């Protein structure tokens, strides 16, 4: 299938509100979230720090929507990969309106929770965030312990490795001792 372009959005930001969860007549879950991304800079004229925040509408479908509803809260930090879509709808007066949002669904959609576990109320849990090991000789190289939820085609799934990968230099025991 020929592609005529790429439509991919990547966001890392914080939720502005708790997720809104609904269910379609077919039973599939839909979650609506707003994600804030900010950039900061120093004003050249005044030297004062400046900040600009953008708010992004994100819609998640299926299992990702259920996970968002259960685990995400206002202030949660998330990594989102999806596609930009514009939809047309009519308001109460019959006027056509348009909404552009990031849609996370199917095999290309990713939602990863960042920032550790959350307690009730959205505050980070004390000691709840796993400590990531520093890489060194003889220590296993483990991926970050944050849960990642991504839909994948069953044929593309790879078997899980049961043994951790060790970052050790190769040992050559056939060498003579140099003294």
UniProtKB/Swiss-Prot annotation:
Family matches, as Gene3D superfamilies: Nucleic acid-binding proteins
Gene name for this UniProt entry: ssb
Official protein name in the record: Single-stranded DNA-binding protein
Region described as Disordered: 117-179
Keyword DNA-binding carried by entry: yes
Domain spans labelled SSB: 6-111
Keywords, in A-Z order: DNA damage, DNA recombination, DNA repair, DNA replication, DNA-binding
NCBIfam families recorded: PRK09010.1, ssb
Biological processes annotated in GO: DNA recombination; DNA repair; DNA replication
GO MF annotation terms: single-stranded DNA binding
Function according to Swiss-Prot or TrEMBL: Plays an important role in DNA replication, recombination and repair. Binds to ssDNA and to an array of partner proteins to recruit them to their sites of action during DNA metabolism.
GO CC term, one of those recorded: nucleoid
Any Pfam family: SSB
PROSITE patterns for the chain: SSB (PS50935)
Quaternary data: Homotetramer.
Highest taxon of the lineage: Bacteria
The UniProt record lists the keyword Membrane: no
Motif Important for interaction with partner proteins: chain residues: 174-179
Taxonomic lineage: Bacteria, Pseudomonadati, Pseudomonadota, Gammaproteobacteria, Vibrionales
Biased composition (Low complexity): 117-165
Species annotation: Vibrio vulnificus (strain CMCP6)
